[in-house]
Amino acid sequence: YQRFIAAPLQEEAANEMFVAQQNFQKATDGVASDSLYKLSLNGSEGKFGFLKIADEYSGTDAGNLANYYAGIAYLNTGKYTEAIDYLNKFKSDDIVLGALAKGAIGDAYSQKNQPKEALENYLKAAESNKNDFTTPRFLLKAGKTALTLGNKSDALKYFTDIKENYEATPEAASVDVLIGLAQ
């Protein structure tokens, strides 16, 4: 099965995804981003977009990764419900990418003015794997969201965690002011 079905499907999915990834990267770089995100979602140049890849190749790594890309593209084009749906379908053992996906779900909920759900996902992102890149980033978002919810004690806990355990990160540079707000 692996050799005759799964491996060829994976290769085919990766080939289909190349143009969509190029469009996504150009959109991320800020070049006519909305239309490029749409091309990355729906396809162009005779190649599938992330939506079709996620559907047609759902059992492959490329199909799974297409869920992530589709979610981020939807997030960046203001379609937050769709972003949440696709990001929730994405599964990853990659410590950074998995956390970024959970954090992006938090961002989508934040944009939908659902701060409790945003906070829940920021905490999942921060705790999914402790590291100097994603953990302080999402602890900071969790703290700001907790402040928005009026939960100063939790916000203080998140900000203090950044100050004490991630002092060399960019997030630590602004955390003293936020600690003052949370006290």
Task: Describe the predicted segments one by one.
Residues A7, D55-G63, T77, K91-A99, ...:
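Short solvent-exposed coil/turn linkers within tandem alpha-helical repeat scaffolds
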Residues G30-E82:
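Extracytoplasmic/periplasmic/luminal assembly and interaction segments
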